[in-house]
């Protein structure tokens, strides 16, 4: 395929006359897959390198941020730093000891010399008191004055229709005009009934005020209104007494195993862990073969002058490899005569020779220093001596360090009940609008009186457990050397001791005068003295041949533990612990004494307007009004119309 492509691209070139070999054909067939695989591998390698580089940079940045946030760089403890740290620790320990001793020291209270009366200035006004209880209803008041007259009552309803006329209908045509008198007498009868009421007259003058009517019957109670909106949150009330301990509830039913939750989000990066303990030293490796001697290096340039301060001591270097065993050297030249040796050690004592002739008595030599013999055996104890007189009392010793506070002892028995206190002031304070004076009077009433006499001593509680031993204190300064004590009385003479061991030989005495020559004694055996000390070492011989590596040595014993390091600085405050279990309920407290009656509170604000009540019952009918003005004459008065709009029946017949 590749050959065909090249041939196609060449265009004008002539095709190869020779056929490709089988190796070339195989290469041509396998080249594209190999190239693709190599390209993929190279791309994967580049991507992995980039990914690892990014991750490494990210990790280094996080470590640097954590170190800077923690602010705990490595500290190399130098001698100056150790001394400074030691002084700081000592000062801190002394401060803690002084604080503890001051807290546990008995404190003396001095009696007050202030008078029993209160001379304190008035304090600031307190908070607004709670609303007082509702007072009892007062007695009924006196009857009030007569009220003004009420308004005019409503117009009354129309009266019932009156009866018709009872007179028959008469024809008056038979009477002549001359007989008017007779006509009048015949026609006029008795006074008729009152006609229908006339039209309403003009309004009359205002009448005198009427009496106040009686109160109507009490109306029915109104429908309860809608519940009001919840008010603002009030102040927190006083803490109630602790309730009694509830009974132990029944054990709950064990819950079912919950389903596995979704995996949580990755947590925040944790802090650097505490460095692990130092690992144990590994086994000593086998010795390697000695390398060949390298060529000698060039002479180095002269170094800069170093500082005069002593450098840090380097770690001991590794032991060098053993040199090759040298070949035996040629015999050396005879050495120079050695230095005269020191006199040899004294040889063993020879056998005693034959006794010589007695010499003349020499002069007495000076006494040598007394030799210190070995300690003799202890003698038998002497008889018990009489008891000596009691010595004078020594000075009072310094106060020892106070031990730690022991565990609290068991609660003692309850003491007898105290006497009943005096009754508090119960007078009611009327402040009359002056709040400052009322507060001053309350302060005067509630001032604490002088302290009463101390109560009887309670029963002695049981002895507490022995406290743990206190921390050993710092070594005190060395005291002055005391004066030499008086010499004690000589003891009883002990029994004579046994014969002591022979003492050391005394010092050589002065050389005596030469005695007379004695008779020649027999020749004693000749004793050869010990050999003299070895001569000085000769020069080192040439290096021997390289020896075989020795066997692996056994591990050396573990070195001793180093001294304890100085106390570290106080660590940072740890995280907040989880809340502990709920403690048992406390016993109910005693009922408190009733407080003083508070002064009346201020007048409350005006309440909201109530809802409109239901319509009351109809009132009593009012009194009859004054008579109206007389109406018009009956003949001239127009007929009153009925409900149908026509004149009333009988009116038009007049």
Curated annotation (Swiss-Prot):
Changing residue 382 to R: In CFEOM5; causes loss of stability; causes incorrect folding. GO terms for biological process: axonogenesis involved in innervation. Residues 181-188 are annotated as: Interaction with amyloid-beta peptide. Expressed predominantly in brain. Deposited preferentially in primitive or neuritic amyloid plaques which are typical of Alzheimer disease. The record marks 112-113 as: Cleavage. Residues 230-245, 336-358, 457-466, 517-527 have a biased composition (Low complexity). The modification Pyrrolidone carboxylic acid (Glu) is found at residue 113. Residues 1-33 are cytoplasmic. It is found in: Membrane. The chain crosses the membrane at residues 34-54. Residues 121-164, 192-247, 249-308, 311-370, 372-425, 447-505, 571-630 form the Collagen-like domain. One of its GO terms (molecular function) is identical protein binding. Residues 280-290, 361-377, 398-407, 603-626 have a biased composition (Basic and acidic residues). It is a single-pass type II membrane protein. Residues 494-503 have a biased composition (Gly residues). It is linked to Fibrosis of extraocular muscles, congenital, 5: An ocular motility disorder characterized by congenital dysinnervation of various cranial nerves to ocular muscles. Clinical features are ophthalmoplegia, anchoring of the eyes in downward gaze, ptosis, and backward tilt of the head. Forms homodimers and homotrimers. Binds to the fibrillized forms of amyloid-beta protein 40 (beta-APP40) and amyloid-beta protein 42 (beta-APP42). Found associated with beta-APP42 more frequently than with beta-APP40. This is Collagen alpha-1(XXV) chain. It comes from Homo sapiens.
């Amino acid at each position: 395929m590749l050959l065909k492509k090249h041939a196609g691209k060449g265009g004008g070139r002539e095709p190869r006359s020779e056929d490709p070999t089988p190796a070339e054909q195989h290469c041509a067939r396998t080249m594209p897959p190999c190239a693709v695989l190599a390209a993929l591998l190279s791309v994967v390698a580049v991507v992995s390198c980039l990914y690892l580089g990014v991750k490494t940079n990210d990790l280094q940045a996080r470590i640097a941020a954590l170190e800077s946030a923690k602010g705990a760089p490595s500290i190399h403890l130098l001698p100056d730093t150790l001394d400074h740290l030691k002084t700081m620790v000592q000062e801190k320990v002394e401060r803690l000891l002084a604080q503890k001793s001051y807290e546990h020291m008995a404190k003396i209270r001095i009696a007050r010399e202030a008078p029993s009366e209160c001379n304190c200035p008035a304090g600031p006004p307190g908070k607004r008191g709670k609303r007082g209880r509702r007072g009892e209803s007062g007695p009924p008041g006196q009857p009030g004055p007569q009220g003004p007259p009420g308004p005019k009552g409503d117009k009354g309803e129309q009266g019932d229709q009156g009866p018709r006329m009872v007179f028959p209908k008469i024809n008056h045509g038979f009477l002549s005009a001359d007989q008017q008198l007779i006509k009048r007498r015949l026609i006029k009868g008795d006074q008729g009934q009152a006609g229908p009421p006339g039209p309403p007259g003009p309004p009359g003058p205002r009448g005198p005020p009427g009496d106040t009517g009686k109160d109507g019957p009490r109306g029915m109670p109104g429908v309860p209104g809608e519940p009001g909106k919840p008010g603002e949150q009030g102040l927190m009330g006083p803490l109630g007494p602790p309730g009694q301990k509830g009974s132990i509830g029944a054990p709950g039913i064990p819950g079912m195993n919950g389903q596995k939750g979704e995996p949580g989000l990755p947590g925040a990066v944790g802090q650097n862990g505490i460095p692990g303990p130092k690992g144990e030293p590994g086994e000593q490796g086998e010795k390697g073969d000695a390398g060949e001697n390298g060529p000698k290096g060039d002479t180095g340039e002269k170094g800069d002058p170093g500082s005069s301060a002593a450098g840090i001591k380097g770690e001991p270097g590794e032991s060098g490899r053993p040199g090759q065993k040298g070949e035996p050297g040629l015999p050396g030249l005879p050495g120079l005569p050695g230095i005269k040796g020191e006199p040899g050690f004294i040889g063993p004592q020879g056998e005693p020779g034959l006794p010589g002739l007695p010499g003349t008595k020499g002069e007495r030599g000076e006494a040598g220093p007394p030799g210190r013999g070995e300690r003799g055996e202890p003698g038998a104890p002497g008889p018990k001596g009489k008891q000596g007189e009691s010595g004078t009392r020594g000075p009072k010793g310094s106060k020892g360090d106070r031990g730690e506070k022991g565990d609290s002892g068991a609660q003692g028995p309850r003491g007898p009940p105290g006497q009943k206190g005096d009754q508090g002031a119960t007078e009611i304070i009327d402040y009359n609008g002056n709040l400052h004076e009322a507060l001053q009077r309350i302060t005067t009433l509630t001032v604490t009186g002088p302290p009463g006499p101390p109560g009887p001593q309670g029963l002695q509680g049981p002895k507490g457990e022995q406290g743990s031993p206190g921390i050993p204190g710092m070594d005190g300064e060395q005291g002055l050397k005391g004066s030499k004590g008086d010499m004690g009385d000589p003891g009883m003479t002990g029994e004579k001791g046994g014969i002591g061991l022979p003492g050391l030989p005394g010092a050589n005495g002065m050389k005596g005068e030469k005695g007379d020559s004695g008779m020649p004694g027999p020749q004693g055996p000749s004793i050869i003295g010990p050999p003299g000390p070895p001569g000085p070492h000769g020069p080192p011989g040439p290096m021997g041949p390289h020896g075989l590596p020795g066997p692996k040595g056994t591990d050396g014993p573990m070195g001793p533990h180093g001294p304890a390091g100085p106390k570290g600085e106080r660590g940072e405050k740890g995280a907040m612990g989880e809340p502990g279990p709920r403690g048992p309920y406390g016993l109910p407290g005693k009922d408190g004494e009733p407080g003083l009656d508070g002064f009346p509170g201020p007048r409350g604000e005006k309440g909201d307007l109530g809802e409109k009540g239901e319509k009351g019952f109809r009132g009593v009918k009012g009194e009859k009004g004054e008579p109206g003005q007389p109406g018009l004459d009956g003949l001239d008065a127009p007929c009153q119309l009925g409900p149908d709009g026509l004149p009333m029946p009988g009116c038009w017949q007049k």
